Amino acid sequence: MKKIALIVAGGTGKRMKSEIPKQFLLLNNFPVLMHSIKKFSHFEKIIVVLPKTQFNYWDQLCRDWGFNKNHIIVEGGSTRFQSVKNGLAKIDEESIIAIHDGVRPLISKTLIDTLISKTKK
């Protein structure tokens, strides 16, 4: 069965009092969201949910960093629930879906694969 990652990254950085949303802050010289996407690079499809106001900024970051991991961008909603719903609406096939927070890049591929294997049982 196809594996799809739905990565939700709709934050604006308000609680951190940062002008830059935390998904775009640098971690080891790379934007945090890029680290998260890379962890799911072995999935057949990656959907990233962002506020529409951040689409152009994300596109520019991808060009600046030469980031070419294949992923689809979907507009987020006013709540996390709505953002996940918007992402799920782009899936039209039976699949195993991993929903992940884009600002949690420290998850290991081993843990991801373990969780996916548990869904198959």
Question: Model-found features: residue ranges?
Answer:
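Conserved short-loop catalytic and cofactor-binding motifs
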Residues: 21, 46, 75, 99-103
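N-terminal glycine-rich phosphate-binding loop and ensuing alpha1 helix
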Residues: 2-55
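Short glycine/serine/threonine-biased micro-segments
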Residues: 8-11, 27, 74-75, 81, ...
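Charged/polar, solvent-exposed surface patches and flexible loops
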Residues: 11, 56, 60, 117
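Active-site-proximal flexible loops/turns
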Residues: 15, 58, 107-108
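Conserved beta-loop-beta/alpha segment of the NTase-like Rossmann-fold superfamily
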Residues: 80-121
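Conserved N-terminal catalytic core of the sugar/cofactor nucleotidyltransferase
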Residues: 33-94
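Short, glycine/charged-enriched secondary-structure capping and boundary segments
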Residues: 20-23, 61-64, 88-89, 111-114
